[in-house]
Design a protein with these regions (language model features):
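Kelch-like beta-propeller repeat domains
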Residues: 1-117
Length: 117
């Protein structure tokens, strides 16, 4: 299964979207899933223990985000998580040893070399 999570509604950066779609390669079909609680693009996304985590990115008007949320495909719902300590966009996420790590990104003024679990 492949998830398409959020994104930019237009090239101006004024419109972030919260929609989530699931692609099933065996059936060659797309299914609409529950949207994120926060519309975002340029965010990090990673799977861990059957759940999907989305963090940071940019919201409407290019606002940098520190919000995080988790998607449970069993309930088809998103739940907010604790905010990150730094607003960041263009970050990478990695799942290692049962933890999600936020790596690098941009805070609006400078590139970040932070790694946070």
């Amino acid at each position: 299964m492949i998830y398409l999570v959020g994104g930019m509604g237009d090239m101006s950066g004024d419109e972030a979207i919260s929609s989530v779609e699931l692609y099933d390669p065996q059936a060659a079909s797309w299914t609409q899933r529950a949207g994120m609680t926060v519309a975002r693009y340029e965010h990090g996304c990673v799977a861990l223990d059957g759940k999907l985590y989305a963090m940071g990115g940019e919201g409407a008007g290019g606002q940098k985000l520190d919000t995080a949320e988790v998607y449970d495909p069993q309930t088809d719902g998103w739940q907010p998580l604790a905010k990150m300590t730094t607003k960041r966009t263009g970050l990478g996420l990695a799942a290692v040893g049962g933890k999600v790590y936020a790596i690098g990104g941009f805070d609006g003024g400078s590139s970040l070399d932070l790694v946070k679990a």
